């Protein structure tokens, strides 16, 4: 099978690339060479949305519009039997520049690639994703804070930038240990009563790769997706059970202990 993969260096795209059967003929693309995809025909085109650029786009730190226009033009013209888009549910509910641009991608796929599968996932987690609820719980990090936290600790202004049209700020560089210790645990950032649909990126990528020749339309969860209240996720970190998320927490904590032990030996 001839497969084109756009966004192969991102947290989801990298996992998809690693899982693609070597029997497939794989072509990889990024924003620098995106339009060269039009030189060939494919069995399947996979596009993994670059969520790592979200904050920079909303703060106008990068000009994403030209890249997006090229992406949409490619979607309109590329010759493929199936088109797979991997994106986030947040683009449907958040009102910011990044969501507006990604919605344009979603609409272009729906209009010009009728044989499509569109994954709009909620809360993703995995080894290569260094942000979000699960990452913060596991690493005691604060990748997102509320405005009032900045009032209390003004020294944080160097580490955070505002998220457009919200009362939240997103981390742009790692916090020094002394600041991290001041902040303590992230209990107040992620609502206890909110429902989070969590999906391990490996299983999402496996689902994509296992269904390369199928057109399934809009997908908001897969078989391995688990739903929890925010309070349940925080509890699972301390009290293990048989869920996929709990196993991920346990494995990650074991890896952390091993790295710490090796570091102490050195």
Language-model segment annotations:
Residues 72, 103-111, 206:
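Conserved active-site helix of classical SDR/Rossmann-fold NAD(P)-dependent CH-OH oxidoreductases
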Residues 72-101, 116-119:
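Conserved Rossmann-fold NAD(P)-dependent oxidoreductase catalytic core, especially the SDR/UDP-sugar
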Residues 10, 61-65, 95-106, 131, ...:
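Short-chain dehydrogenase/reductase
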Residues 154-266:
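C-terminal substrate-binding subdomain of Rossmann-fold SDR/epimerase-dehydratase oxidoreductases
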Residues 99, 108-190:
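NAD(P)-dependent short-chain dehydrogenase/reductase
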Residues 3-23:
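N-terminal Rossmann NAD(P)H-binding glycine-rich loop of SDR-like oxidoreductase domains
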Residues 34-77, 89-93:
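NAD(P)H-binding glycine-rich loop region in Rossmannoid oxidoreductase-like domains
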Residues 25-35:
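A short beta-strand-loop structural module common to alpha/beta enzyme folds
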């Amino acid at each position: 099978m001839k497969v084109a993969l756009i966004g192969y260096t991102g947290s989801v795209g990298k996992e998809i690339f690693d899982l693609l059967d070597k029997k497939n003929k794989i072509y990889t693309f990024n924003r620098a060479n995106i339009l060269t995809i039009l030189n060939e025909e494919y069995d399947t085109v996979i596009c993994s949305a670059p969520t790592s650029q979200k904050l920079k786009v909303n703060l106008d730190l990068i000009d994403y519009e030209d890249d997006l226009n090229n992406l949409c033009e490619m979607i309109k013209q590329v010759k493929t039997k199936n088109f797979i888009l991997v994106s986030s549910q947040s683009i449907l509910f958040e009102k910011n520049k990044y969501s507006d641009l990604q919605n344009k991608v979603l609409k272009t796929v729906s209009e010009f690639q009728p044989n499509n599968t569109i994954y709009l996932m909620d809360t993703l987690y995995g080894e290569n994703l260094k942000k979000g609820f699960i990452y913060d719980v596991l690493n005691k990090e604060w990748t997102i804070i509320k405005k009032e936290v900045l009032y209390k600790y003004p020294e944080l202004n160097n580490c955070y930038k505002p998220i457009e049209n919200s009362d939240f700020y997103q981390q742009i560089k790692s916090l020094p240990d002394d600041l991290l210790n001041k902040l303590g645990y992230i209990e107040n950032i992620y609502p206890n009563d909110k429902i989070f649909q969590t999906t391990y990126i490996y299983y999402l990528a496996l689902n994509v790769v296992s269904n390369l020749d199928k057109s399934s339309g809009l997908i908001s969860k897969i078989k391995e997706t688990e739903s929890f209240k925010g309070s349940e996720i925080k509890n699972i970190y301390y009290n293990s059970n048989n869920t996929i998320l709990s196993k991920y927490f346990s494995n990650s904590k074991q890896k952390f202990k091993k790295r710490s032990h090796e570091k102490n030996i050195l």
